[in-house]
Structure formats: structure tokens, C-alpha cells
A protein has these predicted regions:
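Class I SAM-dependent methyltransferase SAM/SAH-binding core
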Residues: 1-24
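A short acidic, Gly/Pro-enriched loop at the edge of an enzyme's catalytic core
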Residues: 22-34
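Conserved Class I S-adenosyl-L-methionine
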Residues: 27, 101-193
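A short beta-strand submotif of the Rossmann-like class I SAM-dependent methyltransferase core
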Residues: 33-36, 45
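A short, conserved alpha-helix within the catalytic core of class I
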Residues: 42-55
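Conserved catalytic/acceptor-binding region of the Class I
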Residues: 53-125
Length: 193
């Protein structure tokens, strides 16, 4: 993901640094905005929130984003999802924007002393995808691959290739969900030494 971001951001005034949600390595009160997309369920929530708030300027924004495919709008995608659940009946989606983590995120952020003015937004959009792009997106979904195992995941990908072999464009509807929280205007976060 980072490599793709660096390529797309080539020529822009963007600096890249290594870090984790719980320890970004960013100086205290140095950012106007911090965001995390489709992965906020993986790190330690409390440690991440403290770190994001520490790195934000007073009044800065934290934004959590999920971009969830709404397969129900397309019969082909419904068939693909149903095949996946027949192939991996024990599958429990972890990274989906429809998870319990996301369902509780507004209240979890509102309950944090570091943030105020928590706002939730969502919107729908359509993305036209080639079959290869669609398959590539599935290949990037770690929780499905891990739970299915390599053999069943390979069968799943072969199934998608088979049912999309005569299709040029797949119409995929997405629900983008955003949680925005502002830090307080005054901050008492310690400076990183």
C-alpha cells in the first residue's frame, strides 16, 4: 500500500516515514490531520488514539475511513460472495467496514477525553472495475485469505476468474464511511523527546 501511495504521490510535497499506529514517530502537536483507512481495527485502540491525539495540533482532526463494497447491488457480486461463504462457511469478516468495530466506533471516539466534536459521515459511489482490478482487491483482503487458507483462497480466485472471463467491466458499489474527531483547542500532551 505504501509503495502505491509513494508512486501516486510522486512530485507532491509529501514526506514518508515509518511508524505504527501506536507509535508514529511524529513530533507532538505537528499534524493538522491524521487518518487511518480500513485498518484501525488492527492496532491497540487506546494506544493508537493517544498517539494520534499526541501528534495532532490543538483543534486537529483524526479521520478513520472504510470503503466497503456493497455487493448486494450487483447479482454477479452476490454470486461471488455466496460462493465464498459456501467455500469458507466459518468465515467471519474482520476488516469489513460492516464489522462490530465500525458499528461501535462513533461511541468509542465520543468516549475519549482526547477528542470532541465526533462526526460520522457516509456516502455511496460506483466504481467501474476491470476483472483484474476486482480480483486484485480481493487479493488485498488479508482476513479472507488467512481464514480461507491458501488452497481455498486460490479456488475462490479461480472462481472469480471463471465467472468474469467474458466481462469487460464490473460495476461495484461502495459505501464510504468516515469518522472525524477533533482534538480540543488546548492541548496538554507532552512533547516527544
Amino acid at each position: 500500500m505504501r509503495e502505491a501511495g509513494e508512486k501516486q504521490g510522486d512530485g507532491l510535497d509529501i514526506s514518508w516515514s515509518s511508524g505504527r499506529a501506536e507509535d508514529t514517530g511524529l513530533p507532538a502537536t505537528s499534524c493538522d490531520m491524521v487518518s487511518m483507512a480500513s485498518a484501525f481495527h488492527w492496532p491497540d485502540f487506546d494506544a493508537s488514539v493517544r498517539e494520534f491525539a499526541r501528534s495532532l495540533k490543538p483543534g486537529g482532526l483524526f479521520i478513520a475511513l472504510w470503503n466497503t463494497r456493497r455487493y448486494e447491488a450487483n447479482p454477479l457480486l452476490v454470486e461471488i460472495e455466496e460462493y465464498l461463504y459456501r467455500l469458507v462457511p466459518e468465515l467471519k469478516r474482520i476488516s469489513s467496514g460492516r464489522s462490530q468495530f465500525c458499528d461501535n466506533l462513533t461511541e468509542a471516539l465520543r468516549g475519549r477525553s482526547e477528542f470532541c466534536d465526533v462526526l460520522y459521515l457516509e456516502g455511496l459511489h460506483i466504481e467501474l472495475q476491470s476483472p483484474e482490478r476486482y480480483i486484485g482487491l480481493w487479493e488485498s483482503v488479508n482476513d479472507v485469505r488467512v481464514q480461507a487458507g491458501e488452497d481455498r483462497f486460490a479456488r475462490f480466485i479461480r472462481h472469480i476468474r471463471e465467472v468474469t472471463k467474458d466481462i469487460q467491466v464490473i460495476e461495484a458499489e461502495y459505501l464510504t464511511r468516515a469518522w472525524i474527531a477533533r482534538t480540543h483547542k488546548q492541548t496538554a500532551f507532552p512533547q516527544r523527546e
